[in-house]
Amino acid sequence: MTKVVGVYSGKVAQWRGNGKRFETAIFKTRVAGIVAITMSGITDDFQADQVHHGGPDKALCLFASEQYNNIEKQLALSLPRPAFGENLLVSGVDDGELCIGDILYIGTTKLQVSQPRRPCYKISAVHGEPKLAHFFQQTGYTGCYLRCLEPGQLQAGDEIMWHHGEETRVSILDVNRILYGKEIDPQLINQLLLLKSIAPSLRATLRKRLEGTEVDDRRRLYGEFDETTRESV
């Protein structure tokens, strides 16, 4: 059964370590009982970087619980749940199955898959594993963002009723391969650009990819980047 394992929210906090200092809301805690979901997500959930997080196309962040075992095994880590700032930890479905536009009915809410999560250096920093964000990106199992089509209530243990939302099926895993793969697939990118439910920010990134414009992900993956030494600082 596809279901919600946990619901989480968090506040903005200062983090310092490994030569880095930043604000983050990655440290989320379990929300017990029934949780109200608005068009903006969970009322008591906050984002430190409101340029890259939050907003109607990123109302909630979803991550598959099954991926934790793979990450811990591959990188020899022991991780708390949640570890990556997700709002919904789910079981029974993952990024290889969830597609852009898919509709998720959870509790009394109606949610829609809008785009993959794009991992950043803060995930690596707080867990003391420099390779973590890049590992997410390379595997393609990044988790995804949801928009709220109909506000309502949900809670841990709720079953997820999952329906296809677009005639053309492109999974979160496939989108990540398009974004980060060495080869450009113009046909698949054009199929994605035709989807009505694709998030505008993802649409813009895909157009750059199609045009052959190189997107420098080093700052996102490693933080401040020193061009003279070509190392993150």
Explain the meaning of each model-derived region:
Residues 69, 142, 152:
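Glycine-centered loop/turn positions within well-structured domains
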Residues 1-125, 131-132, 164-233:
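Electropositive, beta-rich accessory/interaction domains or terminal extensions
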Residues 101, 156-157:
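Loop/turn positions that initiate beta-strands
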Residues 92-94, 140, 150:
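Short loop/turn positions at the edges of beta-strands in beta-sheet-rich folds
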